[in-house]
Amino acid sequence: MSDTPHADVETTPANPRRRQWLHGAAAGLAGLALGPLATLPARAQGNGTRLRIGFQKYGNFVVLKARGTLEKRLASQGVAVQWLEFPAGPQLLEGLNAGAIDVGTVGETPPIFAQAAGVDFVYIGNEPPAPQGEAIVVLPDSPIRNVAQLRGKKVAFNKGSNVHYLLVKALEHAGLAYADIQPIYLTPADARAAFVQRSVDAWVIWDPYLAAAERQLGARVIANGEGLVRNTQYYLAARKYAAAHPQVLRALLDEVDAVDRWARDHTPDVAAQLSPLVGLDAPTLEVALKRAGYGVQPITDATVAYQQNIADTFSTLKLIPGKLTVASAR
């Protein structure tokens, strides 16, 4: 893990231009992993009395929060757990940049935008790929039958989220450029409203919003991540917190992995538990859960290379300022 930024990227969080860029981007939006933690230096300062976790409305963090096993485990270390909810990954990382949280889980694209904006974090683990858990959808009566027919169309999605990369790769696969569509940057809730009102022609979204759109609206998938992207969920921590409290993060990932292993074999139970928490019926959640990846994995060289490809793609499209080196956040 290197503290030296890439020469083309100013990574000082206090840099006003980068902070302004990050706020602008966010406003437009809505024991397996011990390897990386074992290498973390123990020199940085941090708050050892609490672990502030950023989470989204759906996922294993929601189950972990409901079960309370992490709180019980960390109580013996004198660490209190606090949970803060965010609408999507980019906003969660804005919270990490502001010092509101210490750790969170996001898709594969938010870390790229965040690192480009100077957010000081490290990757501490990831989930297996879940390419079917995100897709480009249209309304059931839409004349659009494939991605190639999105030329000139309005496509809604959360800028800087995992589906942003899916859209770029799907367009590329269909022979289109990003400039060939009209990107409409909306949070999931606003994007769904625009989709229903036919203010946009297509919507790029992830589970469980995807499953809900399919079951409730009859949304038709014209492309998902299969053969295009991995759709990997990453666990990120503020660099200073990770350096000062690796044992706390080890406990977190251990408990997440335990929840994952249980959830993989108890999908109906997880769906029933999540239903009142996320406001979706259990059958819809079961659809989403069956497409998810389970089990915490360590960050590998292959993982870093994949993330670097995403960074290079967005740099080429000039969607992030300059170039960055993903490995510096390892």
Locate each region found by the language model.
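N-terminal secretory signal peptides
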Residues: 1-16, 25-34, 43
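Short, glycine-/small- and polar/acidic-enriched structural segments
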Residues: 44-176, 182-185, 201-207, 222, ...
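Solvent-exposed, polar/charged alpha-helical surfaces in well-ordered, non-transmembrane soluble domains
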Residues: 72, 94, 98, 112, ...
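Sec/Tat-exported extracytoplasmic proteins
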Residues: 74, 100, 105, 115, ...
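Pocket-lining segment of extracytoplasmic ligand-binding domains
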Residues: 109, 183-184, 189-274
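Secondary-structure end/capping motifs
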Residues: 243-321
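Hinge/cleft segment of the Venus flytrap/periplasmic-binding protein
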Residues: 322-330
